[in-house]
């Protein structure tokens, strides 16, 4: 949608009546928390498996457990990185909204300008044809 083709009253009203950036910032914080939990789980799980198979448990079962758990740890690490990226993108969306909001003329000012245009137009048409 090209907002440049919409009247300023519509763009201004939409920008000022919406929920604002807070929900995006809350979502970013939640994604950050999830990323931290996933990273912690990956680190702890990997550490426990490494200690268990390296010090207390030997043989084919140990080797098999280590091989089978590696993809899970990798998945946790990859998912933690992706959730961190999602948090970063949510913060970027909130920042973009804040910038757009700051650059948007408030609805009351748009209404005032429209009113002034109407008054000036009416005044100009009333004095049309009269000598200066």
Curated annotation (Swiss-Prot):
Pfam families hit by this protein = PPE
The highest taxon in the source lineage is: Bacteria
Q: Which residues form a coiled coil?
A: none
Write down the PANTHER family for this protein, in alphabetical order.
GLUTAMINE-RICH PROTEIN 2
Q: Which gene encodes it?
A: PPE50
Family in the record: Belongs to the mycobacterial PPE family.
The record's misc note reads: Was identified as a high-confidence drug target.
Q: What is this protein called?
A: Uncharacterized PPE family protein PPE50
């Amino acid at each position: 949608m090209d907002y440049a083709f919409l009247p300023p009253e519509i763009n201004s009203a939409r920008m000022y009546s919406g929920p604002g950036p807070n929900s995006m910032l809350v979502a970013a914080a939640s994604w950050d928390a999830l990323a931290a939990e996933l990273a912690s789980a990956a680190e702890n799980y990997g550490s426990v498996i490494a200690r268990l198979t390296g010090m207390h448990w030997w043989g084919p079962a140990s080797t098999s457990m280590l091989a089978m758990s590696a993809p899970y740890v990798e998945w946790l690490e990859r998912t933690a990185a992706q959730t961190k990226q999602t948090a970063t993108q949510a913060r970027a969306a909130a920042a973009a909204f804040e910038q757009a909001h700051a650059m948007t003329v408030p609805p009351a000012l748009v209404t005032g300008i429209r009113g002034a245009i109407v008054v000036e137009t009416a005044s100009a048409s009333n004095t049309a044809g009269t000598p200066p």
